[in-house]
Amino acid sequence: VIRVFGGKPNKGVSEKQAVQNIIANMKLACDYAGEKGVMLGMENHDFLIDIDRMLPIVEAIDSPWFGVNFDSGNIARTSNPYKELARIAPYSINAQIKVEIPVDGSKEHADLARIINLLKNANYRGYIVLEYEGGEDPYKAIPSYLKKLRNLI
């Protein structure tokens, strides 16, 4: 799986045109990726942290070489980020789990069990990656978070 991004619209490009550009270019990239046997996972990032914007793009790209690179820490301002993550989980081909999650614009400790359960409920069968960006000493924090994730999986 190669992680890909939709990017940000260039100045003067409408949201509608930006979405059309992403769809057209991802379809081309999927054709090439398929020739090489490579999956492309588009991450909910930048312009696509808004799941209402991301899902129509994902659904428009009908390719066996395409899916979502699920990132639990990249969600637009919402009071229920878990609900938004559950919407992209069924399309996920790779999952990056962060220990913090944005809730109404503020970072909170992520409910790792809830994230793993929503992936399980979507029949996710891919890799789960810990992407640590927390404020604690990573040499102490990462082993603890890995243990929690292993127990949940």
Task: Describe the role of every protein-language-model region.
Residues 1-67, 75-77:
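Active-site acidic/histidine proton-transfer and metal-coordination neighborhood
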